[in-house]
Amino acid sequence: MRLFGNSKEQGICQVGESDVAVSEIKKDEALLQKMGYKPKLHRTYAFFENFASSFAACDCMSNIRGSFYIGLLTGGPSAYWITYIIAIPLQLISAATMAEVCSALPTAGSLYFWASAAGGKKYGRLIGFIVAWWVVVAWTSFVAVNCQSTTKFIFGELPVFNSGFSVSSSDVKFRAVQWAVGEAILLVCVLLNFIPPKWFRYIFRVSVAVILLDFVLNMIWLPIAVSTKYGFRDEAFMKSTNYDLGKVNNGWSWCLTFFCTARILVGYDAAGHVAEETKNASKTASRGMFYSAFSNAILSTGIIVMFLYCLPPSNVMYELIKSNSQQPFVSFYAYALGKRAHVFMNVVGILGMIFDTSLSIVASSRLVFAVARDGVLPFSGWLRKVDSHGQPTNAVTFIFLISAALLCSNLPSAVAFTSLLSAAAVPTIMAYAAVAFGRLFLSRNDFPKSEWSLGKLSKPFQLITFLWNLFTAVILFSPKAYPVTGKNFNYAPVIFGAITIFGLISWLSIPASRWSTFYDASKLDSNSFDDSSSDKKSLEKAASIAEGSITQII
């Protein structure tokens, strides 16, 4: 990591306007140069694009629907809404903590870079290498999981229309068809990422619009249909429990409902990944991160209440869960809205997931680019290259290749791929905990100041973030079915352990000289860019790079 060192890479700063002023880049390129990096990515995105990257990565609609039935089986309705009430404020505190860090260090490396900084001079390199592998694997897995989840909503239609085609995950022929569809979805999402920034910004807008349309339809159309068909659930149902995990303590079964509710907002760090492409990043990226999490929290509150009250009678509900092994929510929509009418609702959700995946590739590719820029990954020299539009297209290709390979794991065994669901979330959650831990104990008084500051709440929020994310990781590591067998074993701890070992191997094999020395925190203060002569010189140098290397974005 070239934090405050002389970068050997010669980069360009691409901008959308040829008359860019020094004042517009003084808190972006100047801060980036003080972190040791020359600007290479385009910087054309504003608040909305930054906000949309995290808003789509979280997408509470897809997150809730994807695992809603699991919560009903582990603890029941009361466990679901109670754990949600507990989880959402704690997730928002975590988002606020990460947003404060993002404001101080707005770089594409995001969690990797922040963890390195939080680790201090003594442990920064070690923590940075481990977290780098955590988050790269997590975000790459996230892309593959999104594609697979989308296929589940597609094939969930077959039981509704009584198709004779098997949709059992134990059927290798079905898994082959599902794999092919998942790969096709991945290809579409990747191709969208080769659109120049000038036009790609519309993908951000469409993604947010589809999610909001999805929300509005569920808040208006669904309750109207339910009220005329079978009516809303009563208070007794909302207070009921259901422990369907076999021989396991009911208290722990209740806690496992956090598997659904504690991960609703995971992914808000996407705004940090695109920080180097965002104008006035010290403020804009942190605001985009927190407000996207807050917006998803508001939407998820309304939608969870609506879903719980709109569920069909219990005997019908559990029959729907059993009859549609791919995605019970599709059968729920069909029962409530009608066999034909529900298709429109499902198509809106599927489109939302496709756009979500495309924006997740944006975030993950920027992360890969930033980690490769510091030489942490294999083939770093190739991965850190950008195209004429200032986009890391080689990193996008890398995401495509790895995600495609991960999708192939579904061919021999459905169990292996199911474990990716936890593997995609756990490393990110542990990275949140690592950043908070480092700031609390390793760089308590040395971390750069933030423009978006939590003030006196900063330390308490860091402690809460650390403890909460550790608890969440324990939940995601736990078995989800009992007794534990080879078919239902949760491989997330095994995958996480392997990722950590790869991080340690990288730390041991890559010399510290190739990663450079650590930063001087006193010089990395995003609030300290005044009009002093030294800062003017840095700004003029950054402006010179920008003006001398402009490529018009088409």
From Swiss-Prot:
Q: Which GO terms describe its cellular component?
A: membrane
Q: Which Gene3D superfamilies match?
A: Amino acid/polyamine transporter I
Span-the-membrane segments of this chain are: 68-88, 95-115, 126-146, 176-196, 206-226, 250-267, 288-308, 343-363, 397-417, 418-438, 457-477, 492-512
Query: Main location per UniProt?
Result: membrane
Question: What PANTHER family does this protein's entry cite?
Answer: AMINO ACID PERMEASE, AMINO-ACID PERMEASE BAT1
Q: What is this protein called?
A: Uncharacterized amino-acid permease C794.03
**Which keywords does the record carry?**
Amino-acid transport, Membrane, Transmembrane, Transmembrane helix, Transport
> How is this protein positioned relative to the membrane?
Multi-pass membrane protein
| Molecular function, one GO term | gamma-aminobutyric acid transmembrane transporter activity
Q: Which GO terms describe its biological process?
A: gamma-aminobutyric acid transport; transmembrane transport
Q: Where in the cell is it found?
A: Membrane
Q: Which family does it belong to?
A: Belongs to the amino acid-polyamine-organocation (APC) superfamily.
Q: Cross-referenced Pfam families, in alphabetical order?
A: AA_permease_2
